[in-house]
Amino acid sequence: MMTAAKRLGLYSALRACSATVFRSNLHPKVTVATMFCSVGTIPDVAEVSFSDSGAALFMSSSLWKVVAGFVPSRFWFSHTCLVFGSNTILFASLNSFKRSSSAIIKKVSLDTPVYVGLEKKNKMQPLLPCFFRRAV
């Protein structure tokens, strides 16, 4: 059974995702929607493995429950969000086929998209947003 708080978190993620798609001019909108708009829940456990992402894990002593927008894209890379939480400082990194790249590290408020990108020739290429909310 989904609580109201979970519904609100998913709704916020969907709204931010829609805004990303409508603002995007980098790719055809269908591609952007397919890459950006898959939303899943990450459970509050010490170690989580995503089967669709290769060997992507995230570990932390104090994990948050988060709502993360992620999809293993058939268009570009197979990737997912790796999330570490400490107060409101969230670290996101990208894991693609044979390359792992650090992405944006910044302070964010809850339900804020954090864009994960692949570094290419010293320029960050945005690939997907991650959406976060604290568990209630």
Curated annotation (Swiss-Prot):
It is found in: Membrane. The chain crosses the membrane at residues 75-97. Its main location: membrane. Residues 1-19 form the signal peptide. GO terms for cellular component: membrane. It is a single-pass membrane protein. Keywords: Membrane, Signal, Transmembrane, Transmembrane helix. It comes from the Eukaryota. Partially overlaps SPT15. This is Putative uncharacterized membrane protein YER147C-A.
